[in-house]
């Protein structure tokens, strides 16, 4: 009944990028060996690969799968991000950041197909946000957010929604299907490599 291991994708987050989907269990090739991986397209816009064992979870690598400007870098050993202070919301300021508080992937599930070896992600790219942090007084029965939020699309963006296919053995995106509007559809993949979304 106790937590045996964990990995924190980012710390002290003020973007509302809590993770709402479970990682996908799959074998992944890295540096000549097969690892038991936890793969997770995070709301923060990064595609995370972690190694799992009975009593440990360790960072392997992470790559942005949508445009992301809040992280300046990731520590290559731990995966801990360094934040770009221009894109970290704080009380008393108005801050723009990408992806939006809905994330690069929100509730809709991604899917892995062992036949194709591909991970399929329902993503929203070119979807950013603005948060105006402000002091609030708690009032029972009222929203207690401490922020005013707005969703934005960068000038010149030609799409938002995507279905992405990633080869997790190479860590590379294989193909993308773009949509003019958001993609809120989950993905199911079958034997024979059909995709339903």
Q: What name fits each language-model region?
A:
Residues 196-197:
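Conserved small/polar residues in nucleotide/adenosyl-binding loops
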Residues 24-56, 60-65, 92-96:
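Phosphate/diphosphate-binding loops
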Residues 1-2, 55-57, 117, 171:
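Short coil/turn linkers that define WD40 beta-propeller blade boundaries
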Residues 40-43, 155-159:
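Short, solvent-exposed loop/turn segments at conserved positions within beta-propeller repeat blades
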Residues 5-25, 63-109, 137-148, 157-160, ...:
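Extracytoplasmic beta-rich repeat domains
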Residues 46, 162-164:
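A short loop-to-beta-strand structural motif that recurs across blades of beta-propeller domains
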Residues 35-36, 117, 192-193:
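Short coil/turn segments that connect the beta-strands within blades of beta-propeller domains
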Residues 98-139, 158, 165-172:
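Long hydrophobic segments that form regular secondary structure
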């Amino acid at each position: 009944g106790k937590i045996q291991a964990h990995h924190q994708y980012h710390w002290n987050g003020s973007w509302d990028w809590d993770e709402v989907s479970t990682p996908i269990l799959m074998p992944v090739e890295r540096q000549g060996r097969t690892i038991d991986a936890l793969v997770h397209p995070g709301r923060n816009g990064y595609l995370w690969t972690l190694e799992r064992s009975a009593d440990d979870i360790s960072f392997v690598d992470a790559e942005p799968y949508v445009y992301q400007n809040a992280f300046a870098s990731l520590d290559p050993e731990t995966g801990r991000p360094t934040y770009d202070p221009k894109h970290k919301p704080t009380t008393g300021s108005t801050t723009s950041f990408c992806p939006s508080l809905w994330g690069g992937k929100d509730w809709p599930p991604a899917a892995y197909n062992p036949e194709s070896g591909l991970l399929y992600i329902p993503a929203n790219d070119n979807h950013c946000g603005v948060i105006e942090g402000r002091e609030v007084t708690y009032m029972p029965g009222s929203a207690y957010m401490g922020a005013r939020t707005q969703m934005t699309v960068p000038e010149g963006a030609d799409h938002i929604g995507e279905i992405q296919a990633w080869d997790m053995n190479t860590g590379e995106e294989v193909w993308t299907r773009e949509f003019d509007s958001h993609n809120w559809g989950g993905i199911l993949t079958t034997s024979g490599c059909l995709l339903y979304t």
